Swiss-Prot record:
GTP binds at G15, S16, G17, K18, G19, T20, R126, V135, Y136, T199. This is GTP:AMP phosphotransferase, mitochondrial. Consists of three domains, a large central CORE domain and two small peripheral domains, NMPbind and LID, which undergo movements during catalysis. The LID domain closes over the site of phosphoryl transfer upon GTP binding. Assembling and dissambling the active center during each catalytic cycle provides an effective means to prevent GTP hydrolysis. GO terms for molecular function: adenylate kinase activity; ATP binding; GTP binding; nucleoside triphosphate adenylate kinase activity. Its main location: mitochondrion. Ubiquitously expressed with highest levels expressed in the abdomen, suggesting a function in muscle tissues.
Length: 216
């Protein structure tokens, strides 16, 4: 458990493992995982107005418009209140980073450096339980029963945006969009970068970093 409030942003390309890393951090340290993608997908499943707007952008491998994401994420942060959290998928541009900085003091920006070729291969093995957003990675985080969610026993599925041609497009867009954001945070001395091909390689280094930060 974190002994003091710890608020971090995690940045990584789609399929880099940032969702899994975020879940591990929160499971081991008692924080809230706030995922832009999960929030948007939940709205798509529920067919809300936000979900209808987001569905087409995600299916085409495009980013959901800035105004929609900013409003949604700041509202969720407000709900979390005075608790530690990991922001996954936000901010994704300088304007969002500035909007976040005006509201919150971020303690660290965690970046995951995973080769794109590894990511494209990895998404072939990623399955989700759509209603909850739980993610399984065959070969690392396997479901107890193949093709079934551990909690509900309901069928798992692959995301529309995990198809190889969509992933390749998203990776190109990620590099273009996120490089300025990482540079912005680097100037503030907040960035910690972790390189590796698999989550199991990155996680031990992550734990050392987190333990150093919370005990500082």
């Amino acid at each position: 458990m974190f002994t003091k409030i710890f608020r971090a942003v995690i940045i990584g390309a789609p399929g880099s493992g940032k969702g899994t890393i975020s879940e591990l951090i929160c499971k081991n340290h008692g924080c809230v995982h706030i995922s832009t993608g999960d929030i948007l997908r939940q709205n798509i499943i529920k067919n809300t107005e936000l979900g209808k707007k987001a569905k087409q952008y995600i299916a085409e491998g495009k980013l959901v418009p800035d105004a929609i994401v900013t409003k949604t994420m700041l509202a969720r942060i407000t709900e979390v209140g005075n608790r530690s959290y990991i922001l996954d998928g936000f901010p994704r541009n300088i304007a969002q980073a500035e909007a976040l900085a005006a509201r919150e003091q971020i303690d660290a920006v965690i970046t995951l450096d995973v080769p794109h070729s590894v990511i494209i291969d990895r998404v072939k093995n990623r399955w989700i339980h759509a209603p909850s957003g739980r993610v399984y990675n065959i070969g690392f985080k396997n479901p107890k029963v193949p093709g079934k969610d551990d909690v509900t026993g309901e069928p798992l599925m692959q995301r529309e945006d995990d198809k190889p041609h969509v992933v390749a497009k998203r990776l190109e867009l990620y590099d273009e969009v996120m490089s300025p954001v990482i540079a912005w945070y680097e100037k503030k001395g907040l960035v910690a970068t972790f390189k590796g091909k698999q989550t199991k390689e990155i996680w031990p280094m992550m734990e050392l970093f987190l333990n150093d930060r919370i005990n500082a």
